[in-house]
């Protein structure tokens, strides 16, 4: 987890150069989670999507801060000890209808769109045999969130 958080911190630093320090990254995760094992680049595509889809030029012109949060926690889910990583933002969000369409797209064949999200979903499904390893939600015009759930495993040294 620690390595993945470093990747997204660096990515957000780059985006701050691009947008002039108008983005904020918040991370909330217990230090005990830092040694948890996660697939490589499981979070960065979600943060990239937040910038690409959630950040409206209008917000930048109105001098609003674009905020992205990553929250990690260990939680039991269906009798499994799991790691939940949630990436959410205060961007423009999507409608309930479009959110449902996006959920349906996860299981469809590649059409060249939603590559990052579909890739994360399929990797979790293949690696952990979890059909519900990715959950998508939106508060219409007040942001978007993606929850990634995988079995909790400590890094072995």
Where do the model's predicted regions map?
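Two-component histidine phosphotransfer core
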Residues: 1-137, 144-149
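Two-component histidine kinase transmitter core
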Residues: 151-155
């Amino acid at each position: 987890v620690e390595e993945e958080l470093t990747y997204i911190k660096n990515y957000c630093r780059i985006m701050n150069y691009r947008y002039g320090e108008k983005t904020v990254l918040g991370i909330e995760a217990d230090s005990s989670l830092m040694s948890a094992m996660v697939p490589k680049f499981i979070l960065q595509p979600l943060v990239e999507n937040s910038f690409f889809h959630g950040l409206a030029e209008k917000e930048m012109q109105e001098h609003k801060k674009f905020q992205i949060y990553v929250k990690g926690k260990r939680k039991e889910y269906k009798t499994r000890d799991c790691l939940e990583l949630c990436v959410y933002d205060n961007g423009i969000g999507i409608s309930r209808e479009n959110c449902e369409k996006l959920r349906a797209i996860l299981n469809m064949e590649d059409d060249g769109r939603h590559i990052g999200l579909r890739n994360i979903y399929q990797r979790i499904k293949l690696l952990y045999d979890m059909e519900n390893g990715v959950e998508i939600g939106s508060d219409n015009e007040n942001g978007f969130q993606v929850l990634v759930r995988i079995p909790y495993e400590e890094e072995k040294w």
